[in-house]
């Protein structure tokens, strides 16, 4: 995951925190993960595209296109679980994860990873699938913890 670390954004500024004051849910989600909060200038999906391409074929162009669409709606980006995953929160408080194993780590939706991202962009609210190694996540006013061992479907 050196690629992600090398392209990490600067920690979120005080001004950006003030701008997010009316969106406490986004910050609460990220603080639940690791408390490492970044501004959305990190372009997380483009940073992760090299890892994705290695494992799943030449997905770079698709990932970058989704990155451009998603970045317009990003509120904050967090780096979590030993720097391996980007935890992103969009303007509506929705959240999703990208990282080295994106098809498993992203929000679970109907179809492939890119179809899941497309659903996010269309405003479909997806619930996370939590694995035993993930942290508790607060999303849409509900708390999910790994020991619940529940699989949520949209």
Tell what function each PLM region has.
Residues 136-138:
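Short, highly charged C-terminal tails/helix-capping segments
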Residues 82-84, 94, 102-105:
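Short Gly/Pro-enriched loop/turn and capping motifs at secondary-structure junctions
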Residues 89-93:
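Short acidic-glycine loop/turn motifs at beta-strand connectors
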Residues 1-86, 128, 140-154:
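A surface-exposed partner-binding patch
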Residues 72, 97-100:
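Secondary-structure boundary/capping motif
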Residues 99-134:
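Compact, glycine/acidic-enriched structural inserts
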């Amino acid at each position: 995951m050196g690629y992600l670390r090398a392209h990490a954004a600067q920690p979120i500024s005080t001004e950006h925190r003030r701008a997010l004051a009316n969106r406490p849910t986004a910050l609460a989600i990220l603080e639940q993960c690791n408390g490492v909060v970044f501004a959305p200038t990190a372009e997380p999906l483009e940073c992760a595209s090299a890892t994705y391409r290695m494992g799943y074929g030449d997905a770079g162009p698709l990932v970058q296109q989704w990155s451009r669409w998603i970045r317009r709606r990003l509120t904050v980006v967090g780096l979590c679980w030993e720097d391996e995953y980007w935890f992103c929160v969009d303007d509506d408080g929705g959240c999703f994860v990208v990282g080295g194993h994106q098809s498993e780590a992203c929000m679970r939706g109907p179809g492939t990873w890119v179809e899941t991202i497309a659903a996010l962009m269309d405003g479909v609210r997806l619930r996370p699938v939590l694995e035993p190694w993930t942290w508790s996540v607060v999303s849409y006013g509900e708390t999910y913890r790994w020991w619940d061992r529940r699989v949520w479907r949209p």
